[in-house]
Amino acid sequence: LGHANAIKLLASLLDDMSDDVDFFINNISGGAVRNAIPSKAQCTICVPEKEIDTAKSKLNELFKVQKEIYAKTDPMMTLEITESDKKDALGYAQTLDLIHFIRSLPNGIMRMSPEFSGIVETSINLGVINSDNDCVKICMLARSLNSDALSDMINTVKSQCYLLDNVEVEESNRHEPWSSPSKNRLIDVLNESYK
C-alpha cells in the first residue's frame, strides 16, 4: 500500500519541471497491465539544446524529493536520464495538456468500506500508458464492492476526459461487484471455527 505509480510520478516530475524548462513529449510509455501499479515508466522529451543541462539538473532535484517521499515503500526507485536524437514531438500545448491530464487522473484508494473494517470499497489504478505517433492510450482499472460507486468512478474519469479535445473513451471488461451476504449460516460457522 502506498507504492509510487511510475506513470503518475513521471507526469509529476515533468509537470514540475515545466515551470523552469520548455520541452515537448516525443513518446511516453509505462506499466504492463491495467490491474497492477506500474513500477516503470519512460518518456522521451525534446528540449532546446541550451536547456538540456537545466532539464537534467531539475529532474534530478525533483526526483530526489520524490525518492524521499517513497523511501519506505519504494527504496529501489531510480531515475535514468539519457540523451536521444529524436526530434518529432507533440506541440507545447499538447505536451502540457497531456502531463496535466495524467497528473489529474484519480489513482489509488478512493473509499474504504463502511461495512467491513479495513477493506477497500472503491479504488482505481492508472495501469498502462503508451504513445504511438500522435495517439496516447491510457488504460485504467476501476474496482468497487458497490455498483453505484463503480459507475461514479468510471463517470468521473469520463468527465475528465471530455474536458480535453480529441479524447475518446472506451469502457470495457466491466466486472459487476458482488457483496457478501451479511447474514449467512455458513459464514457464521466459518467465523466461529476460525476464532
Across the structure, where does each feature detected by a protein language model lie?
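A general structural signal for well-ordered alpha-helical packing
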Residues: 56, 95, 99-102, 123, ...
